[in-house]
Every structure is written in structure tokens, then in C-alpha cells.
Amino acid sequence: MSVSDEVVLEQAQKLSVQVSSEEQARYVVDAVGSRLAAAALGLRDTRTVNSWAHGGPIKGPLHEHRLQALFRVTYAVKERYGPAVAAAFLRGSNPALGNRAPMTVLANESPADAEQATIAAVETLFAS
């Protein structure tokens, strides 16, 4: 992993705790689309994430943490490779995640475990 990759990962982590949930939701929706964002967040439809992107309330810390993790992963991959690769990364089967897609891990695992696992998968992507 190059220095610039480490910088991108560090920026993603810092921004995930500094940027508001509204801005995180807007960034993710703009980067990968509301359908993929909603699926990665474990939401039933796009209305909820679109509401968050426009300042709507997020009910519960689990949703906030899931959004934070999705933002961190999306930011890192998008900044390094662009939005199309970020979307493909979230959708695609990943050997670092037991051949599960990162969006599935983010939606179904505890937010802390999902964040750790998907960031490790991003690091593997950057190292290749």
C-alpha cells in the first residue's frame, strides 16, 4: 500500500467522524446511488437514505454507525478509483470477506464488525 493509499484511508476515517450524518448520506447517495446505499445500510427502500441526505432524522445509533462505516468505505474507494469502482466494490463478491459482497457485510453484520472487515477488504484492494 502506497503512502497516498494510507492518506486516503486516514482521510476517510477522519471525515467519518467529522462530517455530519446528512453530509455522509448525501455523499454516499451521490457516489453509488440510493439503491445501493439503501441495500448496504440494510434499509427496505431508498426513501430513508434519501431523507437522511436531506437532513431527515436517523433513528438509532446502529443506523448512524452503519452509515458512518458505509461512508468510510465508499469515500476511500471513490477517492482512489472513482465512483464506478466504489459501486462495483460494494456489490462484488470479495475473497477477503468470505466471498460475500461488502454491501452484504455492511447490511447484516454488527456495524463495528462490518466496518473492520470492509476496511480490511479496502486495504486488500489498495494493496493489489
Residue spans for each PLM region:
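Non-transmembrane "mature" sequence context
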Residues: 1-128
